[in-house]
Amino acid sequence: MIISASTDYRAAAQRKLPPFLFHYIDGGAYAEYTLRRNVEDLSAIALRQRVLKNMSELSLETRLFDETLAMPVALAPVGLTGMYARRGEVQAARAAAAKGVPFTLSTVSVCPIEEVAPAIDRPMWFQLYVLKDRGFMRNALERAKAAGVTTLVFTVDMPVPGARYRDAHSGMSGPYAAPRRILQAMTHPAWAWDVGLLGKPHDLGNISAYRGNPTGLEDYIGWLGANFDPSIAWKDLEWIREFWDGPMVIKGILDPEDARDAVKFGADGIVVSNHGGRQLDGVLSSARALPAIADAVKGELAILADSGIRTGLDVVRMIALGADSVLLGRAFVYALAAAGEAGVRNLLELIEKEMRVAMVLTGAKSIGEISADSLVRELGA
Protein backbone atom coordinates (compact mmCIF):
# COMPACT_ATOMS: atom_id res chain seq x y z
CA MET A 1 0.00 0.00 0.00
CA ILE A 2 1.28 3.47 -0.91
CA ILE A 3 1.54 5.90 2.00
CA SER A 4 1.46 9.45 0.69
CA ALA A 5 -0.45 11.21 3.48
CA SER A 6 -0.62 10.91 7.24
CA THR A 7 -4.21 9.70 6.95
CA ASP A 8 -3.24 6.69 4.79
CA TYR A 9 -2.04 4.75 7.83
CA ARG A 10 -5.55 4.04 9.11
CA ALA A 11 -6.38 1.81 6.13
CA ALA A 12 -2.96 0.15 6.36
CA ALA A 13 -3.52 -0.62 10.04
CA GLN A 14 -6.96 -2.07 9.37
CA ARG A 15 -5.49 -4.51 6.86
CA LYS A 16 -2.86 -5.75 9.29
CA LEU A 17 -4.64 -5.88 12.64
CA PRO A 18 -7.12 -8.41 14.01
CA PRO A 19 -10.52 -6.65 14.14
CA PHE A 20 -10.66 -6.54 17.94
CA LEU A 21 -7.50 -4.44 18.04
CA PHE A 22 -8.32 -2.21 15.09
CA HIS A 23 -11.76 -1.36 16.44
CA TYR A 24 -10.42 -0.86 19.96
CA ILE A 25 -8.21 2.01 18.78
CA ASP A 26 -10.58 3.21 16.05
CA GLY A 27 -13.80 3.25 18.06
CA GLY A 28 -15.43 5.58 20.54
CA ALA A 29 -18.19 5.65 23.12
CA TYR A 30 -21.88 4.98 22.56
CA ALA A 31 -22.95 5.96 19.00
CA GLU A 32 -19.59 7.71 18.40
CA TYR A 33 -21.03 11.15 17.60
CA THR A 34 -18.25 12.94 19.48
CA LEU A 35 -15.64 10.72 17.85
CA ARG A 36 -16.82 11.89 14.43
CA ARG A 37 -17.28 15.52 15.45
CA ASN A 38 -13.71 15.69 16.72
CA VAL A 39 -12.51 15.15 13.17
CA GLU A 40 -15.30 16.96 11.34
CA ASP A 41 -15.27 20.14 13.45
CA LEU A 42 -11.52 20.47 13.18
CA SER A 43 -11.30 19.81 9.45
CA ALA A 44 -14.13 22.29 8.80
CA ILE A 45 -12.09 25.21 10.15
CA ALA A 46 -10.85 27.32 7.24
CA LEU A 47 -7.26 28.51 7.21
CA ARG A 48 -6.63 32.08 6.03
CA GLN A 49 -4.31 32.01 3.03
CA ARG A 50 -1.73 34.81 2.73
CA VAL A 51 0.81 35.30 -0.07
CA LEU A 52 4.01 37.19 -0.93
CA LYS A 53 5.29 37.14 2.66
CA ASN A 54 8.90 35.94 2.08
CA MET A 55 8.60 32.63 3.89
CA SER A 56 12.15 31.47 3.14
CA GLU A 57 12.93 31.09 6.86
CA LEU A 58 10.55 28.95 8.86
CA SER A 59 10.81 27.41 12.34
CA LEU A 60 8.56 24.82 13.96
CA GLU A 61 10.58 24.66 17.19
CA THR A 62 8.76 25.33 20.42
CA ARG A 63 9.54 25.33 24.15
CA LEU A 64 7.34 23.36 26.51
CA PHE A 65 8.03 22.47 30.14
CA ASP A 66 11.70 23.49 29.77
CA GLU A 67 12.09 21.17 26.77
CA THR A 68 12.81 22.14 23.18
CA LEU A 69 10.49 20.34 20.77
CA ALA A 70 11.20 20.08 17.05
CA MET A 71 7.54 20.90 16.53
CA PRO A 72 4.56 21.42 18.88
CA VAL A 73 3.60 17.75 18.90
CA ALA A 74 3.89 14.93 21.44
CA LEU A 75 2.74 11.33 21.23
CA ALA A 76 -0.26 10.82 23.49
CA PRO A 77 -0.61 8.06 26.08
CA VAL A 78 -2.41 5.12 24.47
CA GLY A 79 -3.18 1.97 26.41
CA LEU A 80 -2.11 -1.40 25.00
CA THR A 81 0.22 0.18 22.43
CA GLY A 82 2.41 -2.91 22.71
CA MET A 83 -0.36 -4.98 21.15
CA TYR A 84 -0.17 -2.99 17.91
CA ALA A 85 3.49 -3.72 17.19
CA ARG A 86 6.18 -5.84 18.81
CA ARG A 87 7.10 -4.01 22.04
CA GLY A 88 5.17 -1.13 20.54
CA GLU A 89 5.80 1.45 23.23
CA VAL A 90 9.55 1.12 22.74
CA GLN A 91 9.25 1.49 18.97
CA ALA A 92 6.99 4.55 19.24
CA ALA A 93 9.24 6.16 21.86
CA ARG A 94 12.28 5.71 19.64
CA ALA A 95 10.47 7.29 16.70
CA ALA A 96 9.43 10.28 18.80
CA ALA A 97 12.92 10.73 20.21
CA ALA A 98 14.46 10.59 16.73
CA LYS A 99 12.12 13.38 15.64
CA GLY A 100 12.73 15.47 18.75
CA VAL A 101 9.26 15.29 20.29
CA PRO A 102 8.06 13.73 23.57
CA PHE A 103 6.55 10.28 23.98
CA THR A 104 3.98 9.74 26.74
CA LEU A 105 3.82 6.27 28.26
CA SER A 106 0.37 5.09 29.36
CA THR A 107 -0.34 3.62 32.78
CA VAL A 108 -1.76 0.60 30.96
CA SER A 109 1.12 0.05 28.57
CA VAL A 110 2.41 -3.39 27.67
CA CYS A 111 6.04 -2.34 28.12
CA PRO A 112 6.85 -1.07 31.62
CA ILE A 113 8.51 2.25 32.42
CA GLU A 114 11.81 0.50 33.06
CA GLU A 115 11.87 -0.96 29.54
CA VAL A 116 10.89 2.18 27.63
CA ALA A 117 12.86 4.94 29.37
CA PRO A 118 16.35 3.46 28.73
CA ALA A 119 15.51 2.95 25.04
CA ILE A 120 15.53 6.67 24.26
CA ASP A 121 17.96 9.54 24.74
CA ARG A 122 15.48 12.28 25.62
CA PRO A 123 13.08 12.78 28.56
CA MET A 124 9.88 10.76 28.56
CA TRP A 125 6.46 11.73 29.82
CA PHE A 126 4.24 9.42 31.88
CA GLN A 127 0.45 9.29 32.14
CA LEU A 128 -1.34 8.27 35.32
CA TYR A 129 -5.02 7.63 36.07
CA VAL A 130 -6.87 8.56 39.24
CA LEU A 131 -7.41 5.15 40.83
CA LYS A 132 -8.75 3.81 44.11
CA ASP A 133 -5.51 1.90 44.66
CA ARG A 134 -3.38 4.80 45.86
CA GLY A 135 -0.56 2.37 46.56
CA PHE A 136 -0.29 1.65 42.85
CA MET A 137 -0.35 5.36 42.05
CA ARG A 138 2.49 6.07 44.47
CA ASN A 139 4.46 3.07 43.18
CA ALA A 140 4.06 4.25 39.58
CA LEU A 141 5.16 7.78 40.49
CA GLU A 142 8.23 6.53 42.32
CA ARG A 143 9.22 4.32 39.40
CA ALA A 144 8.63 7.15 36.93
CA LYS A 145 10.90 9.42 38.95
CA ALA A 146 13.58 6.76 39.17
CA ALA A 147 13.43 6.25 35.38
CA GLY A 148 13.99 9.94 34.69
CA VAL A 149 10.47 10.84 33.58
CA THR A 150 10.16 14.63 33.43
CA THR A 151 6.47 15.37 32.93
CA LEU A 152 3.42 13.76 34.53
CA VAL A 153 0.20 13.71 32.50
CA PHE A 154 -2.66 13.14 34.90
CA THR A 155 -5.85 11.85 33.26
CA VAL A 156 -8.98 13.00 35.09
CA ASP A 157 -11.81 12.24 32.65
CA MET A 158 -12.13 8.56 33.56
CA PRO A 159 -13.83 8.41 36.98
CA VAL A 160 -15.92 5.71 35.32
CA PRO A 161 -15.25 3.74 32.12
CA GLY A 162 -16.98 4.90 28.96
CA ALA A 163 -19.53 2.65 27.25
CA ARG A 164 -17.65 1.49 24.16
CA TYR A 165 -20.24 -0.58 22.36
CA ARG A 166 -18.02 -1.32 19.38
CA ASP A 167 -15.70 -3.37 21.63
CA ALA A 168 -18.45 -5.90 22.30
CA HIS A 169 -19.05 -6.35 18.58
CA SER A 170 -15.36 -6.68 17.72
CA GLY A 171 -14.38 -9.21 20.38
CA MET A 172 -12.38 -6.95 22.68
CA SER A 173 -15.10 -7.55 25.26
CA GLY A 174 -18.51 -9.18 25.41
CA PRO A 175 -19.64 -12.81 25.02
CA TYR A 176 -17.02 -15.35 23.94
CA ALA A 177 -14.45 -12.56 23.61
CA ALA A 178 -11.37 -14.73 24.21
CA PRO A 179 -12.10 -17.39 21.55
CA ARG A 180 -13.17 -14.69 19.11
CA ARG A 181 -9.83 -12.95 19.55
CA ILE A 182 -7.96 -16.21 18.98
CA LEU A 183 -9.86 -16.85 15.75
CA GLN A 184 -9.15 -13.33 14.55
CA ALA A 185 -5.45 -13.69 15.29
CA MET A 186 -5.34 -16.92 13.27
CA THR A 187 -6.65 -15.06 10.22
CA HIS A 188 -3.99 -12.34 10.59
CA PRO A 189 -0.78 -14.43 10.58
CA ALA A 190 1.65 -11.51 10.14
CA TRP A 191 0.37 -9.88 13.32
CA ALA A 192 0.11 -13.23 15.12
CA TRP A 193 3.77 -14.01 14.42
CA ASP A 194 5.32 -10.58 14.91
CA VAL A 195 3.28 -9.34 17.87
CA GLY A 196 1.30 -12.30 19.14
CA LEU A 197 4.34 -14.59 19.41
CA LEU A 198 7.53 -12.52 19.23
CA GLY A 199 6.05 -9.57 21.12
CA LYS A 200 5.53 -11.46 24.37
CA PRO A 201 5.03 -10.92 27.25
CA HIS A 202 1.65 -9.28 26.69
CA ASP A 203 0.88 -8.43 30.27
CA LEU A 204 0.53 -4.82 31.37
CA GLY A 205 4.03 -4.13 32.56
CA ASN A 206 3.41 -1.22 34.91
CA ILE A 207 0.57 -2.96 36.72
CA SER A 208 2.28 -6.37 36.77
CA ALA A 209 5.38 -4.87 38.39
CA TYR A 210 3.22 -3.56 41.23
CA ARG A 211 1.00 -6.61 41.68
CA GLY A 212 3.86 -9.08 41.42
CA ASN A 213 2.16 -11.28 38.84
CA PRO A 214 1.37 -10.99 35.12
CA THR A 215 -1.70 -8.89 34.40
CA GLY A 216 -3.16 -9.88 31.04
CA LEU A 217 -6.01 -8.46 29.00
CA GLU A 218 -8.85 -10.04 30.98
CA ASP A 219 -7.26 -9.07 34.30
CA TYR A 220 -6.63 -5.57 32.97
CA ILE A 221 -10.28 -4.99 32.15
CA GLY A 222 -11.38 -6.26 35.54
CA TRP A 223 -8.69 -4.57 37.64
CA LEU A 224 -8.93 -1.21 35.94
CA GLY A 225 -12.72 -1.20 35.95
CA ALA A 226 -12.76 -1.95 39.68
CA ASN A 227 -10.23 0.81 40.39
CA PHE A 228 -11.82 3.81 38.72
CA ASP A 229 -12.72 6.31 41.43
CA PRO A 230 -15.88 8.41 40.90
CA SER A 231 -15.35 10.13 44.27
CA ILE A 232 -12.20 11.93 43.13
CA ALA A 233 -11.99 15.70 43.65
CA TRP A 234 -9.26 18.33 43.36
CA LYS A 235 -8.32 17.93 47.03
CA ASP A 236 -7.49 14.27 46.37
CA LEU A 237 -4.74 15.33 43.98
CA GLU A 238 -2.87 17.50 46.47
CA TRP A 239 -0.59 14.69 47.65
CA ILE A 240 0.44 14.07 44.04
CA ARG A 241 1.27 17.73 43.49
CA GLU A 242 3.40 17.61 46.64
CA PHE A 243 5.07 14.33 45.67
CA TRP A 244 5.74 15.17 42.02
CA ASP A 245 8.19 18.05 41.69
CA GLY A 246 8.24 18.13 37.87
CA PRO A 247 5.70 19.53 35.42
CA MET A 248 2.19 18.20 36.00
CA VAL A 249 -0.43 18.30 33.25
CA ILE A 250 -4.15 17.71 33.81
CA LYS A 251 -5.66 15.81 30.87
CA GLY A 252 -9.38 15.79 30.16
CA ILE A 253 -10.44 19.46 30.40
CA LEU A 254 -13.41 20.62 28.30
CA ASP A 255 -14.83 23.50 30.34
CA PRO A 256 -13.29 26.92 31.13
CA GLU A 257 -14.23 26.61 34.81
CA ASP A 258 -12.29 23.35 35.10
CA ALA A 259 -9.37 25.05 33.38
CA ARG A 260 -9.47 27.85 35.96
CA ASP A 261 -9.58 25.23 38.72
CA ALA A 262 -6.45 23.64 37.23
CA VAL A 263 -4.69 27.01 37.47
CA LYS A 264 -5.75 27.36 41.12
CA PHE A 265 -4.56 23.83 41.81
CA GLY A 266 -1.10 24.68 40.51
CA ALA A 267 -1.02 22.58 37.35
CA ASP A 268 1.68 23.40 34.84
CA GLY A 269 -0.54 22.52 31.91
CA ILE A 270 -3.84 21.10 30.77
CA VAL A 271 -4.91 18.95 27.85
CA VAL A 272 -8.16 20.02 26.24
CA SER A 273 -9.51 16.56 25.52
CA ASN A 274 -12.61 14.39 25.40
CA HIS A 275 -10.49 11.23 25.47
CA GLY A 276 -10.75 10.89 21.71
CA GLY A 277 -14.52 10.51 21.93
CA ARG A 278 -14.08 7.38 24.05
CA GLN A 279 -15.75 8.54 27.27
CA LEU A 280 -18.95 10.63 27.15
CA ASP A 281 -20.61 10.76 23.75
CA GLY A 282 -22.30 14.07 22.99
CA VAL A 283 -19.76 16.40 24.63
CA LEU A 284 -18.08 19.18 22.69
CA SER A 285 -15.33 18.35 20.27
CA SER A 286 -11.93 19.56 21.46
CA ALA A 287 -11.80 22.05 18.59
CA ARG A 288 -15.04 23.68 19.73
CA ALA A 289 -14.11 23.63 23.42
CA LEU A 290 -10.59 25.03 22.98
CA PRO A 291 -11.21 28.74 22.16
CA ALA A 292 -13.21 29.47 25.34
CA ILE A 293 -10.64 27.65 27.46
CA ALA A 294 -7.80 29.58 25.83
CA ASP A 295 -9.65 32.84 26.51
CA ALA A 296 -9.95 31.83 30.18
CA VAL A 297 -6.41 30.67 31.01
CA LYS A 298 -4.00 31.44 28.15
CA GLY A 299 -0.66 32.48 29.58
CA GLU A 300 -1.35 31.05 33.05
CA LEU A 301 -0.37 27.49 32.13
CA ALA A 302 0.46 25.50 29.02
CA ILE A 303 -2.52 24.48 26.90
CA LEU A 304 -2.29 21.23 24.97
CA ALA A 305 -5.07 19.67 22.93
CA ASP A 306 -5.92 16.28 21.48
CA SER A 307 -8.88 14.43 19.93
CA GLY A 308 -9.46 14.56 16.18
CA ILE A 309 -5.94 15.55 15.10
CA ARG A 310 -4.95 13.55 12.04
CA THR A 311 -2.80 15.89 9.90
CA GLY A 312 -0.31 18.71 10.09
CA LEU A 313 -3.11 21.06 9.03
CA ASP A 314 -5.02 19.97 12.13
CA VAL A 315 -2.01 20.80 14.29
CA VAL A 316 -1.91 24.32 12.83
CA ARG A 317 -5.66 24.70 13.38
CA MET A 318 -5.37 23.70 17.05
CA ILE A 319 -2.49 26.13 17.60
CA ALA A 320 -4.54 28.88 15.95
CA LEU A 321 -7.46 28.08 18.25
CA GLY A 322 -5.27 28.62 21.30
CA ALA A 323 -3.21 25.49 21.99
CA ASP A 324 0.51 25.67 22.69
CA SER A 325 1.03 22.09 21.53
CA VAL A 326 -0.95 18.98 20.63
CA LEU A 327 -0.98 15.28 21.41
CA LEU A 328 -1.28 12.66 18.65
CA GLY A 329 -3.03 9.45 19.68
CA ARG A 330 -4.81 7.31 17.11
CA ALA A 331 -2.74 8.74 14.27
CA PHE A 332 0.54 7.36 15.62
CA VAL A 333 -0.97 4.00 16.60
CA TYR A 334 -2.24 3.48 13.06
CA ALA A 335 1.27 4.17 11.74
CA LEU A 336 2.84 1.93 14.37
CA ALA A 337 0.51 -0.95 13.52
CA ALA A 338 1.18 -0.55 9.82
CA ALA A 339 4.97 -0.18 9.84
CA GLY A 340 6.40 -0.10 13.36
CA GLU A 341 8.97 2.49 14.35
CA ALA A 342 9.60 3.41 10.71
CA GLY A 343 5.90 4.09 10.27
CA VAL A 344 5.77 6.47 13.22
CA ARG A 345 8.91 8.24 12.02
CA ASN A 346 7.37 8.69 8.58
CA LEU A 347 4.10 9.88 10.09
CA LEU A 348 5.92 12.58 12.03
CA GLU A 349 7.78 13.62 8.89
CA LEU A 350 4.47 13.88 7.04
CA ILE A 351 2.94 15.90 9.89
CA GLU A 352 5.90 18.28 9.76
CA LYS A 353 5.67 18.68 5.97
CA GLU A 354 1.95 19.39 6.20
CA MET A 355 2.58 21.94 8.94
CA ARG A 356 5.25 23.66 6.87
CA VAL A 357 2.97 23.98 3.86
CA ALA A 358 0.18 25.37 6.03
CA MET A 359 2.50 27.86 7.72
CA VAL A 360 4.02 29.09 4.45
CA LEU A 361 0.59 29.63 2.94
CA THR A 362 -0.84 31.34 6.02
CA GLY A 363 2.18 33.59 6.51
CA ALA A 364 3.30 32.23 9.90
CA LYS A 365 7.10 32.03 10.12
CA SER A 366 7.10 30.50 13.60
CA ILE A 367 4.75 28.68 15.93
CA GLY A 368 4.31 31.92 17.85
CA GLU A 369 2.93 33.61 14.73
CA ILE A 370 0.10 31.09 14.38
CA SER A 371 -2.95 32.74 15.91
CA ALA A 372 -6.65 33.36 15.40
CA ASP A 373 -5.60 35.62 12.52
CA SER A 374 -4.49 32.44 10.73
CA LEU A 375 -8.14 31.40 10.46
CA VAL A 376 -10.96 32.73 8.32
CA ARG A 377 -13.66 34.53 10.25
CA GLU A 378 -16.87 33.03 8.96
CA LEU A 379 -19.43 35.38 7.42
CA GLY A 380 -21.89 36.52 10.02
CA ALA A 381 -19.65 35.49 12.93
Curated annotation (Swiss-Prot):
Active site: H275 (proton acceptor)
Binding positions (substrate): Y24, Y129, R164, R278
Domain FMN hydroxy acid dehydrogenase: 1-380
Record field: catalytic activity: (S)-lactate + A = pyruvate + AH2
GO cellular component: plasma membrane
Segment forming the signal sequence: none
Subcellular location: Cell inner membrane
Membrane topology, as annotated: Peripheral membrane protein
SUPFAM superfamilies the record matches: FMN-linked oxidoreductases
Tagged with keyword Membrane: yes
GO terms for biological process, alphabetical: aerobic respiration; lactate metabolic process
GO MF: FMN binding; L-lactate dehydrogenase activity
Origin: domain of life: Bacteria
Keywords (A to Z) from UniProt: Cell inner membrane, Cell membrane, Flavoprotein, FMN, Membrane, Oxidoreductase
Cofactor(s) essential for the protein: FMN
Protein residues bound to FMN: 106, 127, 155, 251, 306-330
E.C. number(s) listed in UniProt: 1.1.-.-
Presence of keyword Metal-binding: no
NCBIfam families: L_lactate_LldD, PRK11197.1
Subunit record text: Homotetramer.
Function recorded in the entry: Catalyzes the conversion of L-lactate to pyruvate. Is coupled to the respiratory chain.
Similarity remark: Belongs to the FMN-dependent alpha-hydroxy acid dehydrogenase family.
Protein name: L-lactate dehydrogenase
UniProt organism field: Pseudomonas aeruginosa (strain UCBPP-PA14)
Gene name as annotated: lldD
